[in-house]
Swiss-Prot record:
Protein name: DDB1- and CUL4-associated factor 13
Pathway, per record: Protein modification; protein ubiquitination
Functional note: Part of the small subunit (SSU) processome, first precursor of the small eukaryotic ribosomal subunit. During the assembly of the SSU processome in the nucleolus, many ribosome biogenesis factors, an RNA chaperone and ribosomal proteins associate with the nascent pre-rRNA and work in concert to generate RNA folding, modifications, rearrangements and cleavage as well as targeted degradation of pre-ribosomal RNA by the RNA exosome. Participates in the 18S rRNA processing in growing oocytes, being essential for oocyte nonsurrounded nucleolus (NSN) to surrounded nucleolus (SN) transition.
Expressed in which tissues: Uniformly distributed in trophectoderm cells and inner cells mass in blastocyst embryos. Expressed in oocytes as early as the primordial follicle stage. Endometrial expression increases during decidualization and is highly expressed in decidua.
SUPFAM superfamilies per the UniProt record, alphabetical: WD40 repeat-like
GO BP terms: decidualization; epigenetic programming in the zygotic pronuclei; oocyte growth; proteasome-mediated ubiquitin-dependent protein catabolic process; protein ubiquitination; rRNA processing; spindle assembly involved in female meiosis
Family as reported in the entry's similarity comment: Belongs to the WD repeat DCAF13/WDSOF1 family.
Keyword rRNA processing: yes
Residues modified to N6-acetyllysine: K49
WD repeat ranges per the UniProt record: 64-104, 107-146, 149-191, 194-234, 236-276, 280-319, 323-362
GO MF, one example: ubiquitin-like ligase-substrate adaptor activity
Main location: nucleus
């Protein structure tokens, strides 16, 4: 008689150790799982709710300045070090790990208008209202030595900004004009200007390092080529631009922080139309900085908040504020893309998480898998009304909330007025102008 025996491979169902997870046989035939999509929807809804529950972005407040914080600079080689300059001429170097000030320098008389670090991280530069450019050692003075700059350059006019080249021992300052300096010389290698108004900010391109951009008080954004020592072209906007920041991953793109409450992302090859207009702030935007990934940027505003924008979206994905935080003057995104620092005029530097609900520290493999799965579910169901409503909801201060409502009413009134004018005018006499083209006055080459 023939007997058929059942044989199973124990490797398919037996755990190697008792600490392993039990292996569960699964059949992925969709006919056996008729409620797969409703189950995923519930999981996406729960994941979105939990994201808002665990959204605790504020990490620390670094206090020690005796006047408002006017500028920040990152250390190019160390994630733990950050430099800050105040309105009383004081520069502090902070250790973010210990959340303590490790060094204080009385650098200038009056405001510290700008500061930048050398690309190798051995020294940093500051400019102030006392018409001087100073270079300082990143490491403190030795025992018995006095705190003195490596060298000092006395200029003829007040310098309002400074930035260092990403590869060469060259830096640029701005004021009445844009000056290019060699570190070994006490006079500018070349000077460039276009117009007669003062220039408030200058920034080197991190990819095409010979390019730099500046913004002037006559509403211009001017681009320069350091090889030709001449301006390339400029774009004139309706209102003044406070600062610009280049995208670290896309060589031709930069974002401008404007006085008209908006930010504009431009492609320098086609300046007549912005790539994107970023709208959400309710007061002048004072500073902007990109994440190292180039996918997002953070903006600081006079409305006492900071916002995180995706590069390709016109609305912010996150807004950070506290009860004590006043006008935010400067903001930086750390080099590991995990944290954001902002300095405000009530003398504090605040440290935030870039992702408000992110768990800090080392994650287990199961936690990583669960996070990835939840993220995919939220992306899949992001346009469903309940998921979208929960994900977008933010608590705002009363001042910002009321200003948002006021701006909404004003925008609707302008739109209605334009429609009525078009309705009662000759066809074609009142053209339809897109939001992106409204704010650009002219491009000059």
């Amino acid at each position: 008689m023939k007997v058929k025996m059942l044989s199973r491979n124990p490797d398919n169902y037996v755990r190697e150790t008792k600490l392993d997870i039990q292996r569960v046989p699964r059949n992925y035939d969709p006919t056996l799982h008729p409620f797969e999509v409703p189950r995923e929807y519930v999981r996406a809804l729960n994941a979105t709710k939990l994201e808002r529950v665990f959204a605790k972005p504020f990490l620390a407040s670094l206090d020690g300045h005796r006047d408002g914080v006017n500028c920040l600079a990152k250390h190019p080689k160390s994630l733990a070090s950050v430099l800050s300059g105040a309105c009383d001429g004081e520069v502090k170097i902070w250790n973010l790990t210990k959340r303590k000030c490790i060094r204080t320098i009385q650098a200038h008389e009056g405001f510290v208008r700008g500061m930048c670090t050398r690309f190798c991280g051995t020294s940093f530069f500051t400019v102030g209202d006392d018409k001087t450019v100073k270079q300082w050692k990143m490491d403190g003075p030795g025992y018995g030595e006095e705190e003195e700059p490596l060298y000092t350059v006395l200029g003829k006019t007040v310098y309002t900004g400074i930035d260092h080249h990403w590869k060469d021992p060259v830096f640029a300052t701005c004021g009445q004009q844009v000056d290019i300096w060699d570190e070994q010389r006490t006079s500018p290698v070349c000077s460039m200007n276009w117009g007669f108004d003062s220039i408030s900010s200058v920034k080197f391109n991190p990819v095409e390092t010979f390019l730099l951009g500046s913004c002037a008080s006559d509403r211009n954004i001017v681009l320069y080529d350091m090889r030709q020592a001449t301006p390339l072209k400029k774009v004139i906007l309706e209102m003044r631009t406070n600062t610009i920041c280049w995208n670290p991953m896309e060589a031709f793109n930069f974002t401008a922080a404007n006085e008209d409450y908006n930010l504009y992302t431009f492609d320098m090859r086609a300046l007549d139309t912005p790539v994107m207009v970023h709208m959400d702030h309710v007061s002048a935007v004072l500073d902007v900085d990109y994440s190292p990934t180039g996918k997002e940027f953070v903006s600081a505003s006079f409305d006492k908040s900071i916002r995180i924008f995706p590069v390709d979206k016109s609305r912010s994905r996150e807004v950070y504020h506290t009860k004590r935080m006043q006008h935010v003057m400067c903001v930086k995104w750390t080099s590991d893309s995990k944290y954001i620092m902002c300095g405000s005029d009530e003398m504090n530097i605040r440290l935030w998480k870039a992702n408000a609900s992110e768990k800090l520290g080392v994650l287990t493999s199961r936690e990583k898998a669960a996070n990835d799965y939840n993220q995919k579910l939220k992306e899949k169901f992001q346009y469903h009304p309940h998921v979208k409503r929960i994900a977008r909801h933010r608590h705002l201060p009363k001042s910002i909330y009321s200003q948002i409502q006021e701006q909404r009413v004003m925008k609707e009134a302008r739109r209605r007025k334009e429609m009525n004018r078009r309705k009662h005018s000759k066809p074609g006499s009142v053209p339809i102008v897109s939001e992106r083209k409204k704010h650009v006055v002219a491009v000059v080459k």
